[in-house]
């Protein structure tokens, strides 16, 4: 994305408050919904098969993976992005984002995109309703688009976050 594209995209939203509000609200709703859904999955795993194994002094392997895969991956991605410390579009182009944000750097990869995609894969692996996992992955695409439209990430940031989230989830659940 170049400065002109960024300026047109965010400029349109800045001059159309209703559309800007839709972008901001969509970002919040998807983010909060997923961060609410994930603990619900963990609780379901605890009460469905984890409680019996805990009483026996063991930990259910699926519950362990559902906790450890996203957690370890999240920490690794956070360290990686702090090391890379890529500027955000609003820093690079000195233009205001649509979503109020003043974070400096740490744009690549997008942690929002990473998180929703690794959680989507976690649902695919651990939830008895695979449709929920696919829905979360579809919401991940929406969130990635919203983060770019809002001017807080470059397309490469959300693409890398999505790919890393899927890769870490698949690696953690089906390969390791």
State where each predicted segment sits.
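N-terminal transmembrane-helix/juxtamembrane module of multi-pass inner/ER membrane proteins
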Residues: 1-39, 50-54, 61, 77-105
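Membrane-embedded catalytic cores of phosphoryl/pyrophosphoryl-handling enzymes
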Residues: 97-176
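Generic, well-ordered alpha-helical segments
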Residues: 34, 55-72, 111
């Amino acid at each position: 994305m170049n400065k002109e594209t960024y300026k047109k995209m965010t400029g349109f939203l800045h001059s159309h408050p209703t559309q800007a509000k839709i972008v901001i609200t969509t970002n919040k709703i998807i983010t909060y919904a997923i961060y609410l859904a994930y603990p619900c999955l963990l609780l379901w795993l605890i009460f469905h098969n984890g409680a019996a194994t805990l009483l026996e002094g063991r930990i259910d392997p699926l519950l362990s993976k559902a906790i450890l895969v996203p957690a370890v991956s999240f920490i690794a991605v956070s360290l990686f992005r702090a090391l890379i410390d890529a500027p955000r579009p609003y820093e690079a182009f000195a233009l205001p984002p649509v979503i109020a944000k003043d974070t400096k750097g740490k744009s690549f990869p997008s942690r929002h995109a990473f998180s929703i995609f690794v959680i989507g894969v976690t649902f695919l692996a651990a939830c008895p309703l695979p449709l929920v996992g696919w829905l979360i992955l579809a919401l991940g695409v929406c969130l990635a688009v919203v983060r770019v439209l809002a001017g807080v990430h470059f397309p490469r940031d959300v693409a890398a976050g999505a790919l890393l989230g899927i890769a870490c989830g698949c690696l953690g659940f089906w390969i390791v």
